């Protein structure tokens, strides 16, 4: 199917929010893309893309940082949910590693600590669809943190569909459209036959009914 227009996306998003039953929490707005003629178990059919959403997610992702020294200090000052030093990393038990994986949406790791982070945190992060992100020692960690607060990991695991948040129900529909277009445009470039590999696009809130986007 061709990628939907801005108007088609907006119509579906407005309906998804409108038809969603009210809850006592802020619901996410989700984008679901069903694929066709793609084998998710093959290298060319496997999608794993980090995408930075230009209009944010309505609720920041929780960022944890593995670093020492100045980078650790800046990360703390910049509002990291948790900062783990090298010594603390090496002392983490499997239970502690699972707690980090549960608490943190993104784990940013100074590059010289990546090997240890992969060995210690990797087994806990992997099953949750999360990955440690390498950060060069000279990078501005606060800027990197701020970028990842609005980042999503788009992946299809072993199923021919992808599902991700594009924001929250209280966001401007125009902003949700821009986020959805950003994701769909990137996805189109990663599929073997582009938009021809897309069978269906659906939007919904956390607890609401699915609304199919007409393309």
Curated annotation (Swiss-Prot):
Note whether RNA-binding occurs among the keywords. yes
A molecular function annotated in GO for this UniProt entry is: structural constituent of ribosome
The record's Gene3D superfamilies line, in alphabetical order, gives: 3.30.190.20, 3.40.50.790
Pfam families per the UniProt record, alphabetical: Ribosomal_L1 (PF00687)
Look up the record and give one Gene Ontology term from the biological process aspect: regulation of translation
Q: Which UniProt keywords apply?
A: Repressor, Ribonucleoprotein, Ribosomal protein, RNA-binding, rRNA-binding, Translation regulation, tRNA-binding
**SUPFAM superfamilies per the UniProt record, alphabetical:** Ribosomal protein L1
The cellular component terms of Gene Ontology attached to this UniProt record, alphabetical and capped at eight, are:
large ribosomal subunit
Describe its partners and assembly state: Part of the 50S ribosomal subunit.
PANTHER family found in the cross-reference section? 54S RIBOSOMAL PROTEIN L1, MITOCHONDRIAL, LARGE RIBOSOMAL SUBUNIT PROTEIN UL1M
- Tell me the function of this protein: Binds directly to 23S rRNA. Probably involved in E site tRNA release. Protein L1 is also a translational repressor protein, it controls the translation of its operon by binding to its mRNA.
In the record, the note on similarity to other proteins reads: Belongs to the universal ribosomal protein uL1 family.
Name of protein: Large ribosomal subunit protein uL1
This chain's source organism reads: Staphylothermus marinus (strain ATCC 43588 / DSM 3639 / JCM 9404 / F1)
Q: What is the lineage of its organism?
A: Archaea, Thermoproteota, Thermoprotei, Desulfurococcales, Desulfurococcaceae
